[in-house]
Regions:
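Active-site regions of metal-assisted phosphoester/phosphodiester hydrolases
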Residues: 1-146
Length: 146
């Protein structure tokens, strides 16, 4: 069983001062590894969505959102998928229900496994199950050797 200690923070701390720097994970005490998984609603870079030019500035691909995501990584976290596949294109986890987006693979990668840097080398694979339907997102899976 893992126990996570989270430091109480005021809302403005993140908005004005970035992520706390007193530990590699910001507000979570060492030395326990951390894995964050879920829909973060941000495409981190142009490679993470089909149409970056027409979506620049839109929710999920604004400069501010992308900068905050980058701050998270700089605070001691790793994007597990990009760690293994830095140049892979067309790998998406969300598609609009409109315009046959999923059929045409016109999607966004907005679902993530984020790990603390200390366990990034234990990540074996990250898989997107784009063939599983039932949502506008697909299930994602990470194989990690802890």
């Amino acid at each position: 069983m893992w126990r996570i200690k989270i430091k109480a923070m005021k809302n403005h701390d993140i908005h004005h001062g970035g992520y706390p720097k007193e530990s590699p994970t910001g507000c979570i005490s060492k030395p326990k590894p951390i894995i964050i998984c879920g829909d973060l609603n941000v495409a981190a870079s142009e490679i993470d969505l089909k149409n970056p030019k027409s979506n620049r500035g839109n929710a999920g691909f604004s400069d501010e959102e992308r900068a905050k995501f980058q701050e998270l990584l700089e605070a001691g976290f790793t994007d597990a998928f990009r760690h293994l596949y830095p140049d892979r294109e067309g790998a998406y986890t969300w598609w609009s229900y409109r315009f046959n987006a999923r059929k045409n693979n016109a999607g966004w990668r907005i679902d993530y496994f984020i790990t603390t840097d200390d366990i990034k080398d234990k990540i074996k694979d990250v898989i997107f199950h784009s063939d599983v339907f039932g949502s506008d997102h697909c299930p994602i899976e990470m194989d990690i050797d802890l």
